[in-house]
């Protein structure tokens, strides 16, 4: 049992985290073993280090922390047993992918991913799958570079073709003059 002072400390800590986080995702964790949750935390730690956490916190404490961090419309997520995934560093979409794939791998009901906030915007359980299917920041950068690079590559090939043709014409003129 936590003392009042410990609870106040948790609320203060969570409020500060929620003010600077890019992702808050609420999930029902019942049915998972301690080993399962340890595996999920390991996957997150492998990708994010200390930049992401999956934490079980009492709903009353989460409610106070979210209220202090000035979030609105979160009450629907705090029904039943609730764990919270939050990301303070790195790509938040990748964290959604990790937990979504974890639930899929464990054959858990995906609706148990209750929803949350991505970059301050609320999303529902139904939208979790759509977010998980978004490309990561690295993939988006690669697509952007590919799109920028394609016209430049085309220009290089066009210019090299013109130069090649010029060389052929000059060689033909040289051969004609040498005859």
Curated annotation (Swiss-Prot):
Domain of life: Bacteria
GO biological process: translation
Keyword annotations of the record: Ribonucleoprotein, Ribosomal protein, RNA-binding, rRNA-binding
A Pfam family per the record: Ribosomal_L10
Record's keyword annotation contains rRNA-binding: yes
A Gene Ontology molecular function term of the record: structural constituent of ribosome
UniProt keyword Ribosomal protein present: yes
GO cellular component: cytosolic large ribosomal subunit
Family per similarity comment: Belongs to the universal ribosomal protein uL10 family.
HAMAP family: Ribosomal_uL10
NCBIfam families in the record: PRK00099.1-1 (NF000955)
Primary role: Forms part of the ribosomal stalk, playing a central role in the interaction of the ribosome with GTP-bound translation factors (such as IF-2, EF-Tu, EF-G and RF3).
Stated name of the protein: Large ribosomal subunit protein uL10
